[in-house]
Amino acid sequence: VFTATAPDDSVSSMHIEELVARMPEVGRNLVTVYRRLRDATEELEAYRSHATTETSLPAERPMPFEEVRDFFYDRNNYIGELDIAAERMFAQSGMTVGGLDVQLSALMHERFGVRVVIDADLPAHAKRSYDPETKVLRIAQWLLLGQRAFQIATQLALVSQPELLSAIVATDDQLTPESRGVARIGLANYFAGAFLLPYREFHSAAAELHYDIDLLARRFEVGFETVCHRLSTLQRPQLRGVPFIFVRTDKAGNISKRQSATAFHFSRVGGSCPLWVVHDAFAQPGRIVTQVAQMPDGRSYFWLAKTTAPEGQGYLGQHKSFAIGLGCDLMHADKLVYSTGITLDDPSTAVPIGAGCKICNRSACAQRAFPYLGGRVAVNENTGSGLPYSPVTEVV
């Protein structure tokens, strides 16, 4: 399952999924084994990188944000008890879609004694500031209405669900103390998304609109990124949506956000694949670009990507630029409006991509930036090739 080059009699992904469904404990053990293999691979790369520099550096451990990403990945990016709690509070509080920033401000004051103030004097990049002593929540004036609602809903999670947040974090005894703090914020953000986009209503709208992100954003008064992230969480048993992979990357290929309800693998070393359509979005800012891509394991995915609109920080201010990517297994692509007019059943049209050059075994890739980690590059001074670091002849 985990080898770089699968033999002809390798177990199919369908069989693996069936095994996990029938025996969840086996599935968890497979995930654990795979994670250990991945960590060992990345540790080897770290040792190689340090071999020519400092030899006294302490052993690296996963960063808190990496641990929290694994925390959500292990749960298929769906936190059932928190999702249901947000949906229940939305309904019991008489909330309706539209103008949620105003409705949430009233809810915070009436139910929790928290006064929400729209503040123009917060630090330049601050979005939210809460004082537990005075129970005043300050929200940055420059935020859009949907962004204001999200920040208020995040604080709502922290003041209304502290025990639930702690209980969910406590289910993972592998988290470090620092990671636990990051996980609480991540769970509060999850609650906020689930509150603004209540599961059943949003799930129904997504199917009705064929997952048209712009139309969903307009209906629920939130941004493109918020809709994409919420779509990646629609994995409630008996009411699942399309299992999406959600990513956010910058022009240099650094992935700052990644969540997956699928088996799609992201590399932590050597950057992401330059052939991946998410990088093409920067060449067409504001437009949605699509791609049918195939991974080295043979699985094919449908991807769409779009750049985010920069926040108004003034002409001399520092502007953030990201591309949002949303992908799913090719078998689900026909449910998406973005697959209209695209050939989905011809494998020859799929773009061969990988998780990252250092862990990708495609020896015939002309775009390769690094040699395959653990492989040997054949060097023959009597020949020349247009393929960098080729061929990978064996794995050691």
Question: Where on the chain are the PLM-derived regions?
Answer:
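Short juxta-domain linker segments that transition from a proline/glycine-rich
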Residues: 1-396
